Structures are given as C-alpha cells and as structure tokens.
Amino acid sequence: MEKSESSTIQIAESSKDRKGKAPLLPPPVHHERAAGYKRGVAIFDLILRISAATAALAATIVMGTTEQTLPFFTQFFQFRASYDDLPTFTFFVIAMAIVTGYLILSVPFSIVCIARPVVAAPRILLILCDTLTVTLATSAAGASAAIVYLAHNGXSDANWLAICQQFNDFCQRVSGAVVAAFVSAVLLIFLVVLSAIVLKKH
C-alpha cells in the first residue's frame, strides 16, 4: 500500500497585513488609570463637600442663635441685640441654611461619582449647582461682613456708632459666623475647580 504524505505550507504575514490588523481586546491600562484618577478626585470632593456642609451648618446655627441683652435697662428701654434686628443677618441665616441643605443633599451624588467615576452626568449637575451655591454663600457672607465691620468700627460720616464695645458677645458670635460662611464659600470654590478638572479629562 502506498501512503501519501501531506505537507503544509505556512505563509508568513507581510508587514502591511500585520499593521492593518488591530488587536481585538486592547489592554485597558489607560482607561483604568483615568478611572482611578477620577475616583481619587471624587473622594477628595466628598471630603471637601462634608467640610463645607459642616462650616455652613455652624455659620447658620451660630448666627441664628445670636442674641445678647445688657444687664442694665431703663424704665422704657431694655438694651438687647439679636440677629433678626438686622435684615442682612436674617438673609444670612436663610441663605446659609439653603447652602447647608444643598451640600447635604449633594453628598449622594458625590458618592455616585466615586462608584462610577467615568459617568459625566452627576459631575455636570454638581458643578452647575455648586456654582449657584457659591454665589449665594459669598453674597450672604459679604453683606454680613460689611455689617460686622460697621458694628466694630461704626461710620462717623453717617453718625453710626460702634456697638461692639457694649455688645461684645454679640459681635464675637456674628464675626465667627461670617468667618465660617467664608470658609464654606472657599471650599465650594475648590469643589467647582475639582469638577472642572475632572470634566476636562473626559
């Protein structure tokens, strides 16, 4: 019996064919690295967000509970100072309460950005709302800072007397509330910058 031998001929691919073919599953190194970077930024965002909420809450509580009554009084007058005597401080309490509420409600969206760092929709929503909240916080803090300055120094041109020599505790508390509001506003600005950096990487 005759046995037929079969031989196989292997043809090497040319360099042009090799260049034209792309790998089916490219290594996802760059994608994983970008996701890890965005997740780290999102964690830092969450920390700043909680810190800003704490500062805004402290500013709201301190200003909203500020009241001082002097130990002496006359037959017709009792010398008392409260935050609601001034419309600017009332606006401050309302504005910072809104800022606090927003920051607390935005925490779940920040957690979503940690869990799914590649998704851009939560980050876009946060940067828009953060920008509006920065405007509200800075307007409340700036207006109240002007009143605090007048309370400490007065205005001789307008014949406004400084009241902090008499209402020392009142002035210390409102000053602390304004400082806390500015801290919250600065942290909100950092949050806007972080969101802008992450969106630029998309």
From Swiss-Prot:
Keyword hit for tRNA processing: no
Main location per the UniProt record: membrane
The name this protein goes by in its record: Casparian strip membrane protein 1
Composition skew (Polar residues), residue ranges: 1-13
Residues covered by region (Disordered): 1-30
The protein's assembly and partners: Homodimer and heterodimers.
Annotated localization: Cell membrane
Protein family membership: Belongs to the Casparian strip membrane proteins (CASP) family.
Lipid bilayer topology: Multi-pass membrane protein
Record key words, sorted: Cell membrane, Cell wall biogenesis/degradation, Membrane, Transmembrane, Transmembrane helix
Function, in words: Regulates membrane-cell wall junctions and localized cell wall deposition. Required for establishment of the Casparian strip membrane domain (CSD) and the subsequent formation of Casparian strips, a cell wall modification of the root endodermis that determines an apoplastic barrier between the intraorganismal apoplasm and the extraorganismal apoplasm and prevents lateral diffusion.
Source organism of the structure: Triphysaria pusilla (Dwarf owl's-clover)
InterPro entries: CASP/CASPL, CASP_dom, CASPL
Transmembrane segments: 43-63, 91-111, 131-151, 178-198
BP term (GO), one: cell wall organization
Entries under Pfam families matching the protein: CASP_dom
Extracellular side: 64-90, 152-177
Parts of the chain on the Cytoplasmic side: 1-42, 112-130, 199-202
GO CC annotation, single: plasma membrane
